[in-house]
């Protein structure tokens, strides 16, 4: 299976880049995982709703350029479905059984995702009602994908 993490902005902190690299390495025996970063827009501290919508639209255009025809797209969004690790593992297994060979997870920028990206997604997924830094969310997502593959392989890791 091919998995892309399509995300807005670059990870600046070395410890987060190291964690991302570690989980990509661990996942390499299960899937080919690519992290695709699109440029983020500068967001003024007290931006108007109109400006925020324009920023999300620009970032959304960049994301949409990387979403592949035929890929199953999962958009991380606070209003998405909340799953346990076991449920995510079951979904990934089910998608594979139904012929999904390319899975794309989308992580928006600090303002979230443009509505067009959410409409393109096959499934919205929420990790929590809380807000997480989008750079950290990459690590959390990769860890959960790794955990899902370990669960599906009946290998020790998940407790």
Curated annotation (Swiss-Prot):
Reactions catalysed, as given in the entry: pseudouridine(1915) in 23S rRNA + S-adenosyl-L-methionine = N(3)-methylpseudouridine(1915) in 23S rRNA + S-adenosyl-L-homocysteine + H(+)
Q: One GO MF term, please? A: rRNA (pseudouridine-N3-)-methyltransferase activity
Question: What residue ranges are annotated as transmembrane?
Answer: none
User: What compartments host this protein?
Assistant: Cytoplasm
Q: Which NCBIfam families match?
A: PRK00103.1-3, tRNA_RlmH_YbeA
Q: Which InterPro entries match?
A: Alpha/beta_knot_MTases, RlmH-like, tRNA_m1G_MTases_N
User: Which segments of the protein form a coiled coil according to its record?
Assistant: none
Q: Where does S-adenosyl-L-methionine bind?
A: 76, 108, 127-132
Q: What is its EC number?
A: 2.1.1.177
Top-level lineage group: Bacteria
Q: What does this protein do?
A: Specifically methylates the pseudouridine at position 1915 (m3Psi1915) in 23S rRNA.
Assembly, per entry:
Homodimer.
- Please name the Pfam families in this protein's record: SPOUT_MTase
- The molecule here is called Ribosomal RNA large subunit methyltransferase H
Gene Ontology CC terms, in alphabetical order: cytoplasm
The UniProt keyword set, sorted, is: Cytoplasm, Methyltransferase, rRNA processing, S-adenosyl-L-methionine, Transferase
Q: Which family does it belong to?
A: Belongs to the RNA methyltransferase RlmH family.
Q: Does the keyword Disulfide bond apply?
A: no
């Amino acid at each position: 299976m091919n998995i892309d993490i399509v995300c807005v902005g670059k990870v600046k902190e070395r410890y987060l880049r190291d964690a991302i690299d570690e989980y990509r390495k661990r996942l390499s025996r299960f899937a080919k995982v690519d992290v695709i970063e699109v440029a983020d827009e500068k967001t003024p501290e007290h931006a108007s709703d109109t400006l925020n919508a324009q920023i999300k639209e620009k970032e959304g255009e960049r994301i949409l350029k990387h979403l592949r025809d035929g890929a199953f797209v999962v958009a991380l969004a606070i209003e998405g479905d909340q799953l346990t690790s076991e449920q995510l593992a079951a979904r990934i297994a089910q998608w594979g059984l139904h012929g999904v060979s390319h899975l794309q997870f989308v992580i928006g920028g600090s303002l979230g995702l443009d509505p067009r990206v959410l409409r393109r997604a096959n499934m919205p997924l929420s990790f929590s009602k809380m807000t997480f830094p989008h750079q950290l969310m990459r690590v959390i997502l990769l860890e959960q994908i790794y955990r899902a593959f370990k669960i599906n392989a009946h290998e020790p890791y998940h407790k």
